[in-house]
Amino acid sequence: MKRRLWLLMLFLFAGHVPAASADSACEGRFVNPITDICWSCIFPLSLGSIKVSQGKVPDTANPSMPIQICPAPPPLFRRIGLAIGYWEPMALTDVTRSPGCMVNLGFSLPAFGKTAQGTAKKDEKQVNGAFYHVHWYKYPLTYWLNIITSLGCLEGGDMDIAYLSEIDPTWTDSSLTTILNPEAVIFANPIAQGACAADAIASAFNMPLDVLFWCAGSQGSMYPFNGWVSNESSPLQSSLLVSERMAFKLHRQGMIMETIGKNNAVCNEYPSPILPKERWRYQMVNMYPDSGQCHPFGRSVTRWETGKNPPNTKKNFGYLMWRKRNCVFL
């Protein structure tokens, strides 16, 4: 009952929150949990290796057997369940140049002031660069709507702010960032970055290549795990890049767990310090909600950015992050 009341309040509140006014550089709107969501992106839905419902976007591998036997606490020791796979809306991201601008909530937090203000600039070689802040929200939409009822197959809880880059010194300082991604130096060369062309092509026609984990497809390089973007050609593209970096960063920090679409392994969740790119999708929800489609990580924005990236915007963006979940419905 409490969850339904919370959802009703969200629905009534959505669309009635004025754009952030405390900061003239901040703009946003509350995400409507019904009308702003691409509900077809939850598909395909699978039972074992069988597709129960088809989807428009490519799917990952699933367990071959629909019936799984999983460990259980005493006195049961073993439980039998159905192996299901679906795409779960599990997080929202704000991307902004204005510190404290909560794009997906529609207001600004004045406490941050001008700390680590985002920017766009050119270096001495006249190369475009920019800096963005990212906020990560826990957004367990399937739990609110009771779409999936097994606790082992959904992200529970309420909407919550899980991460603010403004209070993370590694997000603004590239030297500190190396603490989280010391391997970045290995891939900071033309050969490694040239290999990212293969990831961009794979993302454009199917799914990204997990083996090229340092690549963000058409968006550029996953490293470093901070808000600095070099060679910026499009603010919208940069906003996607830093959102994907944040997903990688939270995986590295152990804040996001991963499921595996294999027999037996499907019973549990596991830490994954390397981002499984093929198991993630994104959908724009701010400033121009796109409830008709979602896209694999790394896919070029040229397919859908028309009308969503005008030059007179204040460079504030919001995305809904979808994650593939394989689990055992008990």
Swiss-Prot record:
Keywords noted in UniProt: Conjugation, Periplasm, Plasmid, Signal
Signal peptide as annotated in the record: 1-22
GO cellular component, one term: periplasmic space
Domain of life: Bacteria
Compartments (UniProt record): Periplasm
UniProt keyword annotation of Signal present: yes
NCBIfam families in the record: PRK13737.1
Note: May be part of a periplasmic complex containing other proteins.
Protein name stated in the entry: Protein TraU
Native organism taxonomy: Bacteria, Pseudomonadati, Pseudomonadota, Gammaproteobacteria, Enterobacterales
Primary gene name: traU
